[in-house]
Amino acid sequence: MTAMENVLEYVTATIGGQLFGLPISRVQDVFVPDRLTRIPLAPPEVAGLLNVRGRILTVIDMRRRLGVESTKNVGKALAIGVEHGGESYGLLIDSIGDVLKLSTVDQEDNPINLERGLAQASAGIHRLDGKLMVVLDLDRVLDFGPAAKAA
């Protein structure tokens, strides 16, 4: 990498067998969710509410949100704490990975054959040693407004 390239850091996470990257600047913490309170009439991807160190978080089931399913049992879920629009969220993931420093020059547009749900939540992709890392656009992932439902 040259000094002219922009480098971004990503926290990697696996959801339904797919590798995702979340901008590290948006990640507050990683934790094991406990005592989730269900919310009646909430959208199916909203798993419930959670109190984490005095903060109330809306917990999002990322498998459902992204339309990613997995046939294997992954055991106890983890959550990544993020903020969006002044609200705190916990994003349920299957596993947490490494922090990667990647050049913005190497980021590619979404492939044309990327599943629609992933494409709508993606800011692009990185190819890593035969794997595809989808870069999540957290603003799109956490947009539950009418415009998002119409898309």
Give names to the regions the model predicted.
Residues 1-151:
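An acidic, low-aromatic, low-complexity terminal/linker signal
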